[in-house]
Every structure is written in C-alpha cells, then in structure tokens.
C-alpha cells in the first residue's frame, strides 16, 4: 500500500522538477512585465508567455529523450514510449497539457463573467494576481496527469478537433479582415502620396502569393493526385476553381463600383492559404499508398506543416489582440465579417466620468480574450500531434494501450475550413453590394 501511495507523490515531485525551471522563468518574466507595464499590453504579453511555455512543454512531450527522463523520474508511472505494438502516451501527454491551459483560461473566463468587465475588480483579475495564476496553472498541470487515459482520448479525438476547427474559422475571419485592411492601406498610400514602395509591396506581394498558391496546387497534383486518387483530384480541382472564381469576383465591375479598393491583392492571400490547407489536409489522409506518399516517410514535411500552423496560431492571437486594442481608434469597414466575435472582443466605450485609467484598461472584453486562448490551446494540441486520433484498449493483463493514427476527421476539418475561407471572402466582396449603408468607403 505504501508503494502504491508513493507513486502519485513521486509523480508530483518529478513533474515539479521538470516544470520548475519553466515556471520560475515564467513567474520572473511575467511579474517583471506586469510591474513595468500596468496596462493591457503587459497582460497580453504575460498570457502569451504562459501560452508559449505550455506549448513548449507540450512539444517536449513528443521528445523521446524528454519522455525517457520523465519516465525514470516518475519511477515508471508515466510511460511515453511508442513501440511497434502501438503503445504510445506522448500524444496523450500533449492533450493533458492542452487540458491544463484550457481549464486555466475557462476558469478565468468564468470568474470574469461574474464581474462587471469595466470594474476595477475585473481589471485587477485580468491584469494582475500573477502569482495566483501561476500556481493555478501549475496545479492544473499536475492534476491533468492523473486524468484517465480514456477520457483524454475522447478529449483529443472529439473536443480538441471541434475546438481546433472553431479556432481555424475564427482565424480565417481575421485573415480575410487583414487581407482587406492591408491591401486598402497600400492602395490609399498609392493614391494619396504616389508611393513607389507601396506600389512595389502591393504588386510584388500579390504576384508572389499567387505564385506560391499555384506552386502548392501543382505540388498537390504531383504528389497526391495519382490516376487512382479521384478524391484528391476532385478536392484539389475544386479548390483551384474556387480560387479562380474569387479572383474574378474581386475585380468584377459591380464589386469595383461598390468597393474600388477590392482587388487581386486580397484574393491572392486567400488563394495562398487555402492551397496550403488543401495540401496539408491531403497529407493528413490515412496512408493509402499512392494517394498519400507522405504518410509514413516524410517527417520533414510534417515539421514544416507544424511551423506554418504555429505561425498561423500566433498571427491569430496577435492580430486579435491588436484589433481589440485599436478598433476604437479606427473605423472598421469589415466588421460585418465577424460582427458577433468582434462585439465580444471589444467592449463599448465607458460612460462619461470614468477615469482615464479605466478607459485605457478595459477597451476589450476579457471573457472573449480567454475564449480565444482556449481555442488556440485546442489547435496547438492538434497541430503538435499531427491531428492524430487515439484509440484506447486493454489487454488481458489490464494494461492500457493507445494506438495512434490518422483519420478523415482532420482531413475534412481542413477541407471545409478552406471552403469557409472562400465563403468569407466572397461575402466580404458581396456585402458592400447588398448593404452599402454599412460599408463606408
């Protein structure tokens, strides 16, 4: 009995040692930031550091060296090895840390929902109390390693995939908004100051993104569209036709009449990203020989996909924060793209008589801020595990085994989100025609 009781204690001690350095670094950096920057900027940076450390630990869980050390420190309680029989816990460990970050932000969102967002109490909870937050994150991390593996398998296969899909859709809305905003600013500079650099950036980036999208499409045809792979051929062809359609739509005379700034610059960005999504989706298809030659061999391509996905994640978080902070200072002509989320992301102006400090510190909705991080945690876990699915079973000796493999769920998530991206961009082009009073040129 003593030996059994000592296992959880040894595990907690081991995990404390593993994440101790990261936690110490996090506490030091966060406290120094929040002490020097008493504003939303300090809070955003602090939460970003926490997200980065949690993601870094999740990535370490996929390292054989890190897992072997942690297994030894836990006296064999934690097993992370991936053997030929399919026994593998490293993917589950990633979902455990994802669960930690999700519960952390959901808890803060729940607490903040009980307070008035404009109150000093809510501002204090959002921007301060970092020693308590670090302890909360640490305790949740320890607790996550005692959650049954079967629950984590359900978490990773169902909940995490749905959360990842929502994060991608939200990121796509921001991507379309960014495409319009960036292109319009370049056009404005060209029209007002005849800036040669703006012309170069606008034309060069447009051509460059079309070239990248075309190259990705060709690579998809070459590697994934063999004569027997009709599904891959259909998906890639549909995406190519959609790219051509949205490009033609962006320069249609009617669209240009209601929004002269619309053009190929925005559609090129949409094409570039959707072509990447299709390539990534087919690369995640369960290995069926010629239809997915990257299924088991090309680990480098999967690492590249992780890098692109990580860049997309940080872009979404950063741009979401920037939009929330700056939206009150500029008119948003494309707010109809994401009216609900934008309304949640930015609160209404404070009533007259409020202090300048409150006006500065409560210019966005704290609850939506944490929801974005919840979705980002889901997406990061799916990204690090290559959207793998897990199946848990027990043998006659009651040993728990976890099988790792690809599934069509991840494939369809990426395919559908690419179609959603096209749909969002089409809507952004047509909305000024249908609702000209909401579109201010």
Swiss-Prot record:
Q: Which InterPro entries match?
A: TDE1/TMS
Q: Where in the cell is it found?
A: Membrane
Is Ubl conjugation tagged as a keyword?
no
Chief location of this protein within or outside the cell = membrane
This entry's Gene Ontology molecular function terms read:
phosphatidylserine floppase activity
Which family does the record claim for this protein?
A: Belongs to the TDE1 family.
What protein am I looking at? Membrane protein PB1A10.07c
Annotated organism of origin: Schizosaccharomyces pombe (strain 972 / ATCC 24843)
Q: What is the lineage of its organism?
A: Eukaryota, Fungi, Dikarya, Ascomycota, Taphrinomycotina
């Amino acid at each position: 009995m003593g030996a059994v009781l000592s296992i959880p204690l040894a595990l907690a001690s081991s995990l404390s040692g593993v994440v101790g350095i990261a936690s110490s670094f996090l506490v030091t950096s966060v406290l120094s930031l929040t002490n020097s920057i008493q504003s939303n900027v300090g809070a955003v940076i602090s939460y970003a550091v926490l997200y980065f450390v949690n993601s870094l630990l999740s990535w370490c869980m996929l390292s054989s060296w890190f897992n072997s050390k942690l297994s030894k420190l836990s006296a064999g309680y934690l097993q992370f090895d991936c053997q030929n029989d399919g026994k593998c816990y490293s993917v589950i460990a990633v979902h455990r840390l994802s669960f930690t970050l999700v519960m952390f932000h959901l808890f803060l969102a729940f607490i903040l929902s009980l307070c008035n967002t404009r109150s000093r109490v809510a501002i204090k909870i959002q921007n301060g109390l970092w020693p308590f937050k670090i302890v909360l994150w640490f305790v949740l991390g320890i607790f996550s390693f005692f959650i049954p593996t079967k629950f984590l398998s359900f978490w990773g296969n169902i909940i995490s995939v749905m959360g990842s899909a929502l994060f991608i859709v939200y990121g796509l809305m921001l991507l379309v908004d960014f495409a319009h905003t960036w292109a319009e600013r370049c056009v404005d500079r060209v029209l007002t100051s005849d800036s040669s650099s703006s012309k170069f950036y606008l034309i060069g980036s447009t051509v460059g993104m079309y070239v990248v999208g075309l190259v990705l499409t060709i690579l998809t045809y070459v590697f994934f569209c063999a004569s027997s792979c009709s599904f891959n051929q259909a998906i890639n062809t549909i995406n190519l036709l959609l790219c051509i359609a949205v490009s033609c739509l962006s320069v249609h005379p009617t669209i240009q009449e209601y929004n002269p700034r619309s053009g190929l610059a925005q559609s090129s960005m949409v094409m570039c990203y959707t072509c990447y999504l299709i390539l990534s989706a087919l690369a995640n298809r369960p290995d069926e020989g010629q239809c997915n030659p990257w299924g088991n061999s090309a680990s480098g391509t999967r690492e590249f996909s992780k890098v692109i996905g990580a860049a997309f994640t940080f872009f979404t978080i950063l741009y979401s924060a920037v939009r929330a902070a700056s939206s009150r200072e500029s008119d948003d002509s494309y707010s109809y793209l994401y009216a609900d989320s934008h309304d949640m992301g930015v609160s209404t102006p404070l009533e007259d008589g409020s202090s300048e400090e409150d006006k500065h510190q409560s210019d966005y909705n704290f609850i939506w801020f944490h929801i974005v991080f919840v979705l980002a945690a889901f997406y990061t876990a799916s990204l690090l595990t290559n959207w793998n699915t897990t199946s848990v079973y027990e043998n006659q000796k009651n040993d728990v085994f976890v099988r790792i493999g690809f599934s069509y769920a991840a494939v369809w998530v990426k395919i559908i989100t690419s179609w959603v991206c096209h749909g969002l961009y089409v809507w952004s082009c047509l909305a000024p025609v249908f609702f000209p009073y909401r579109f201010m040129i």
